[in-house]
């Protein structure tokens, strides 16, 4: 898999479906690899270690990245296998969870007085945006459900 091919494909004004699929696959692979790396870091580095804190923030940011091909059918997987990373609201919630943990560790790593450093400030701002987005999404779901119930025929 070559990043330059995907970058060239995405550089056009309207990316093709296959370019979007490739971009989504690379993003999902990056999230999977970062999550595996986090497992290893958590085994050898203590809570609040700067490297662990930074890695958590990067994993959260990767999960928060917009999905380009969320409507494309997933590859066929056994039904009992959990798909990682998730899509939609579950992915957004995963990003929020990683960023909350990152913020806690950044405050230990770089100090409470300066809000966990530059990365800590960026994580805080991103968390505010994501929590707002999650609230909007939840409100949209509630509205859609109410409309769906209202549109049902009454017997």
What feature does the model see in each segment?
Residues 1-155:
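Non-catalytic accessory regions of eukaryotic chromatin regulators
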